[in-house]
UniProtKB/Swiss-Prot annotation:
Key words of the record: Chloroplast, Isoprene biosynthesis, Lyase, Metal-binding, Plastid, Transit peptide
Positions bearing the site annotation: Transition state stabilizer: 99, 198
Protein name: 2-C-methyl-D-erythritol 2,4-cyclodiphosphate synthase, chloroplastic
Domain of life: Eukaryota
A Pfam family per the record: YgbB
Length: 222
């Protein structure tokens, strides 16, 4: 666990249910409605983060022109839980069993950015032993990682992410997920790529018992 107390936000992230925007349905074929997670408490959490930097005492990394980071995450899928991917509520009969909202895509993107900066991983900065992050919206973690990236003098060069899950099919939701990911990163869509793969019914991923994601990021000196 990171030792500096300033690694953490000042107060718990609220988890009360909030309204979610629905995507516009296509003409044909009919697709399940999507819900963009925008908690009403997110603005308050962002204000808290502004007043309490996450790694105030951490030295800036060497001024390399480029830095590369890799992120990986995996969560069990359990019946009756929400399935959140890239900040989007995906219709499914199973969801991620996790301390926060279990957003496997955002978690691995955060880890990739932190890794590129040479900082502790998401589990150290936002540990699952801390009740403040119980049910937390993962966009809070994303915004903090992006803030640290800019404070270190870097910007996103490009990002390539791969989701691995057997069900549901992600293709109907992929562009909505990618668009929200671009918004959280403050990045142009041309530098953010998202792919989805099944696991050919092999092991827990292929048996619809888990979901995983890999992400590689390239950061460029401003």
């Amino acid at each position: 666990m990171a030792t500096a107390s300033s690694l953490f936000l000042a107060s718990p992230v609220a988890t009360a249910p909030t309204a979610r925007a629905r995507s516009t349905p296509s003409a044909s074929p009919a697709r399940p409605s999507l819900r963009l997670r925008r908690p009403s408490t997110l603005a308050a959490a962002a204000v808290q983060a502004e007043h309490q930097p996450a790694v105030a005492a951490a030295p800036k990394p060497p001024a390399l022109p480029f830095r590369v980071g890799h992120g990986f995450d995996l969560h069990r899928l359990e019946p009756g839980l929400p399935l959140i991917i890239g900040g989007i509520d995906i219709p499914h009969d199973r969801g991620c069993d996790a301390h926060s909202d279990g957003d496997v895509l955002l978690h691995c993107v955060v880890d990739a950015i932190l890794g590129a900066l040479g900082l502790p991983d998401i589990g150290q900065i936002f540990p699952d032993s801390d009740p403040r992050w119980k049910g937390a919206d993962s966009s809070v973690f994303m915004r903090e990682a992006v803030k640290l990236m800019h404070e270190a003098g870097y910007e996103l060069g490009n990002l390539d992410a791969t989701l691995i899950l057997q069900k549901p099919k992600i293709s109907p939701f992929k562009e909505t997920i990618r668009s929200n990911l671009c918004d959280l990163l403050g990045a142009d869509p041309s530098v953010v790529n998202l792919k989805a793969k099944t696991h050919e019914k092999v092991d827990s991923l292929g048996e619809n018992r888990s979901i995983a994601a890999h992400t590689v990021v390239l950061l460029m000196r401003k």
